[in-house]
């Protein structure tokens, strides 16, 4: 049911990152990096993006010395689950990528491997920024 899927999303997208952050903090880990969502904002009108923004806030409140919040647009790569709406969005945005310039660059889809490489680079270098949109994630790896 839709309620069950919504509940599973809450467990996966909220509880897991927050619990991992709490465990990391309690074990004196100084840095924390995680993948959120493009346009995440507690004030967003979209429930999903509002939810993601609240998760970001909760993790920021853990006061890590260094934090990396990756906000990719559509993530490209192999997935086990089938998300028809997301698949349509990926196809559409791949087609639109050449015209996504200027402030729209953060809407470009990005490969999951690029996000992972950017997180590793962020962990190993002195980069004084905590939130990275899709275009900024790609620039980290170039």
Language model features: what each stretch is:
Residues 1-11:
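Single conserved hydrophobic/aromatic residue that forms the stacking wall/gate
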Residues 12-16:
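Glycine-rich NAD(P)-binding loop of the Rossmann-fold in SDR/ketoreductase-type enzymes
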Residues 24:
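Hydrophobic pocket-lining residues that define ligand/cofactor binding sites across diverse proteins
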Residues 27-31, 63-65:
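A short helix->loop->beta-strand "cap" motif at the edges of active sites that frequently abuts
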Residues 32-38, 70-72:
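SDR active-site strand-loop-helix element
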Residues 42-141:
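Oxidoreductase cofactor-interface core, primarily capturing Rossmann-like NAD(P)-dependent enzymes
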């Amino acid at each position: 049911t839709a309620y069950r899927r919504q509940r599973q999303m809450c467990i996966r997208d909220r509880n897991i990152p927050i619990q991992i952050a709490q465990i990391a903090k309690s074990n004196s880990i100084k840095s924390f990096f995680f993948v959120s969502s493009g346009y995440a904002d507690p004030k967003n009108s979209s429930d999903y993006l509002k939810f993601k923004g609240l998760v970001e806030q909760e993790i920021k409140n853990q006061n890590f010395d260094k934090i990396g919040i990756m906000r990719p647009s559509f993530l490209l790569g192999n997935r086990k689950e089938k998300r028809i709406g997301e698949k349509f969005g990926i196809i559409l945005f791949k087609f639109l990528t050449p015209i996504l310039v200027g402030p729209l660059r953060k809407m470009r889809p990005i490969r999951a491997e690029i996000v992972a490489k950017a997180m590793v680079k962020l962990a190993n270098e002195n980069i004084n920024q905590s939130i990275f949109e899709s275009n900024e994630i790609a620039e980290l790896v170039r």
